[in-house]
Amino acid sequence: MNRRALLFASLAASLASFGAMSTARAAPDVMVIYIGGQDCPPCQQWRANAHPRWLASSEFQKVSYFEIEPILLKEAYDERSWPRALRPVLEQVPRKSGTPRFLIVHESRIVSNQLGNSAWMNTLADLKQYLE
């Protein structure tokens, strides 16, 4: 399976399970969205270091999580790279450039918009107030 097919398959699986996750999780109205690119060195660095810890965290268990990570970084903000259900979030992003970007969406509205590897810690701090 090539990388693009794998990416689309994982996105489809994430969206397909969204309804089930919403009823099982404590804060279904909170989403975290990672925006990156497979050809983005800072994104690869985040994936290697912070991503595994994020997936193992208690916070991860309490949110809906989505990844927008096309093969080419320049496509990260293209509408076709986003699942249809998340396109209203894309419309809210004020500056559609720069990665890695971390969004927190609460009640269909972006409440945290952090850019860069160093901003991941700010994202986690922001997230805590929506999970309490």
Spell out what each predicted region is.
Residues M1, F18-I33:
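C-terminal segment of N-terminal export signals and the immediately downstream linker at the start
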Residues M1-A12:
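N-terminal secretory signal peptides and thylakoid transit peptides that target proteins
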Residues G36-D39:
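Short pre-active-site segment immediately N-terminal to redox-active cysteine/selenocysteine motifs
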Residues C43-S58:
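Typically the conserved alpha-helix immediately C-terminal to a functionally engaged Cys/Sec
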Residues E59-P83:
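Thiol-based oxidoreductase modules, predominantly thioredoxin-like and allied folds used
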Residues E79-G98:
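Short, internal strand/loop/helix patches
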Residues T99-S112:
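A short, hydrophobic beta-strand/beta-hairpin element that forms part of a small beta-sheet core
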Residues N117-E132:
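Thiol-/selenol-based redox modules, centered on thioredoxin-like
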